[in-house]
Amino acid sequence: TYYELIKAAILALKERNGSSAQAIKKYILENNKIEFQQTFLR
């Protein structure tokens, strides 16, 4: 699910002040073979 992908990305990025939506999206696209739906990008 998207929730699990986002959670894994946040934990992996380990950014001190939180992870931006762009950073999360980039991490997920680089580490998983999926294509985002337009609604996810909002």
Swiss-Prot record:
Pfam families xref list: Linker_histone (PF00538)
Top-level taxon of the source organism: Eukaryota
Keyword match DNA-binding: yes
H15 domain segment(s): 1-42
Cited function: Histones H1 are necessary for the condensation of nucleosome chains into higher-order structures.
Subcellular location: Nucleus; Chromosome
Family named by the database record: Belongs to the histone H1/H5 family.
Record organism: Olisthodiscus luteus
GO MF annotation terms: DNA binding
Gene3D superfamilies documented for this protein: Winged helix-like DNA-binding domain superfamily/Winged helix DNA-binding domain
InterPro entries: Histone_H1/H5_H15 (IPR005818), WH-like_DNA-bd_sf (IPR036388), WH_DNA-bd_sf (IPR036390)
GO BP, one annotated term: nucleosome assembly
Record keywords, A-Z: Chromosome, DNA-binding, Nucleus
Record-given protein name: Histone H1B
GO cellular component: nucleosome; nucleus
